């Protein structure tokens, strides 16, 4: 049964993954992000895997990436170089690489985050 008060489109997936529905509801009621339970989010049309090693991409960041893509397309007519400092999940670097003629370097001080970013880059063919 899908509760009306929890807006999770992947409820069926979650209940299969977490067979104990009470445990699942307990986690959600503590504020644990459903994105971590699901394991991925959509960001700029890309599937981005997320877990506790990285922050969950925000809608506002998607807007920033869209504006950056539009600006770069208007201002540059050649291949550009982009550095994504503190890449986390890699969602920004992946989205920029897929939408711009560019060299993209993603950096982070966390090896765990770089592992997530690398797997997301492979997942999204970038």
Where are these regions (language model features)?
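Auxiliary N-terminal substrate/complex-recognition segments of SAM-dependent methyltransferases
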Residues: 1-126
